[in-house]
């Protein structure tokens, strides 16, 4: 995770309506970037809300619903609410105002339902994928009232990502993440979706932080 200060997460667990918001440009971004962390927070009682900005059509064959893949994957991770949008894949930078409004609307809807967001996870501003950068830009505006915003790591920002905060999870959390990613059958051919890749990265970041898995 990329943040100046992560703080103590215990304050997040005061009640079951404590909200965590996760934002991704495409189906699988959230699961790849913070899947184990979300599973851990869900188990501790946080209400997980996810937003996916595009259908990810440019990344798979026609006729496949990547939103459905993510819905199943995020369910495994304990996500209670998923909001999906259909902004144009690979061209989201042209719709920033509309994306900001869409995220704003989700936040307000959830707040009206009694959910109190204390943290948001979003994409990194130095990501090589233009949709990921747009997701970051929109999130920073739309989530301005949320006390803490953390940026997660994805394969397309690996070279530029320098973690400033680490979140530890256990073996069960890692297995949850690996199990969730298996629902993304349209992406199973990609190297970064393989369990050995996911585990190796978690171990590497753990070594950096003096933990078992991050």
Go through each PLM region and give its residues.
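Active-site adenylate/phosphate-handling loop in enzymes that bind or generate adenylated species
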Residues: 102-156
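Short histidine/acidic/glycine/proline-rich micro-motifs that form metal-
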Residues: 55-60, 88-92, 124-129, 184-189
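Structural signal for conserved beta-strand scaffold positions within catalytic alpha/beta enzyme cores
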Residues: 52, 84-86, 122, 151, ...
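Short aromatic-enriched loop/helix-cap "lid" or pocket-rim segments at secondary-structure transitions
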Residues: 62-64, 133, 160-165
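The feature marks non-catalytic terminal segments
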Residues: 1-2, 7-14, 109-113, 146-148, ...
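Residue-level signal for the nucleotide or nucleotide-sugar donor/cofactor binding architecture
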Residues: 25, 130, 172
